[in-house]
Amino acid sequence: MDHSHHMGMSYMDSNSTMQPSHHHPTTSASHSRGGGDSSMMMMPMTFYFGFKNVELLFSGLVINTAGEMAGAFVAVFLLAMFYEGLKIARESLLRKSQVSIRYNSMPVPGPNGTILMETHKTVGQQMLSFPHLLQTVLHIIQVVISYFLMLIFMTYNGYLCIAVAAGAGTGYFLFSWKKAVVVDITEHCH
């Protein structure tokens, strides 16, 4: 049976058994597509601790030494802390920019000579206001950072996963201690 259309991926039939493999999780397999050569990185499906040939978000950003992994750990840790701080900053800005709602009551004559109180609610927030535009930009930044952190965690590299979790925990500890909101309205990926 011809499996050339599977782009270098190997498959087993129902009679074969899988042998344990000690290949590095990012071993590349070359394949041809439409006459052009390209390389495909095999994504690990289990957690591992290593620093050789670890791609971090972009194909040109490859970790190969312990020093590079230490630098990546610090950068990812700080990014996760920044994410938590950004969530709290957005909540604070939202609370400050919310227009207080005023209720005006006035007596209105009702049927049979009764007097009713008519209440008007005044809200002054607009879609094209500076606070709303700022919240929109900060929301975009927060979403992008949350996806970056998710993709970093999905490398299954133990060091990078620890950096994400430790950075998020430290950021929460540092920035959320005054947080009075029980429901987190700006949560994206937890």
Curated annotation (Swiss-Prot):
Transmembrane segments: 62-82, 133-153, 157-177
GO CC aspect terms: apical plasma membrane; basolateral plasma membrane; early endosome membrane; late endosome membrane; plasma membrane; recycling endosome membrane
Primary location recorded for the protein, binned into one broad class: membrane
Catalytic activity entry: Ag(+)(out) = Ag(+)(in); Cu(+)(out) = Cu(+)(in)
Membrane-side (Extracellular) residue stretches: 1-61, 154-156
UniProt-annotated stretches for the region Disordered: 1-35
Keyword terms of this UniProt record: Cell membrane, Copper, Copper transport, Disulfide bond, Endosome, Glycoprotein, Ion transport, Membrane, Oxidation, Phosphoprotein, Transmembrane, Transmembrane helix, Transport
The keyword Transmembrane helix appears for this protein: yes
Position of sequence motif Bis-His motif: 5-6
PTM annotation (Phosphothreonine): residues: T114
Cytoplasmic side: 83-132, 178-190
Molecular-function GO terms, alphabetical: copper ion binding; copper ion transmembrane transporter activity; silver ion transmembrane transporter activity; xenobiotic transmembrane transporter activity
Membrane topology: Multi-pass membrane protein
Residues linked to a glycan: N15, T27
Processing after translation: O-Glycosylation at Thr-27 protects from proteolytic cleavage in the N-terminal extracellular domain.
Site (Cleavage): M42, M43
Modified residues (Cysteine sulfenic acid (-SOH)): C189
Domain notes: The C-terminal domain mediates copper(1+) binding and is involved in the copper(1+)-dependent-ATOX1 interaction. The C-terminal domain appears to act to limit transport through the pore by regulating the rate of exit of copper ions at the intracellular side. The N-terminal domain can collect copper(2+) from copper(2+) carriers in blood. The N-terminal domain, in the trimeric arrangement, tunes its reactivity with copper, promoting copper(2+) reduction and copper(1+) stabilization thanks to the presence of histidine (His) and methionine (Met) motifs.
Subunit-level organization: Homotrimer; is stabilized by cisplatin via interactions between cisplatin and the methionine-rich clusters, and could be crucial for the copper(2+) reduction process and copper(1+) stabilization. Heterotrimer between SLC31A1, CCS and SOD1; this heterotrimer is copper(1+)-mediated and its maintenance is regulated through SOD1 activation. Interacts with KDR; this interaction is induced upon VEGFA stimulation leading to SLC31A1 and KDR subsequent co-internalization to early endosomes, thereby activating KDR downstream signaling in endothelial cells.
Official protein name in the record: High affinity copper uptake protein 1
Organism from which the protein derives: Pongo abelii
Lineage start: Eukaryota, Metazoa, Chordata, Craniata, Vertebrata
Annotated gene: SLC31A1
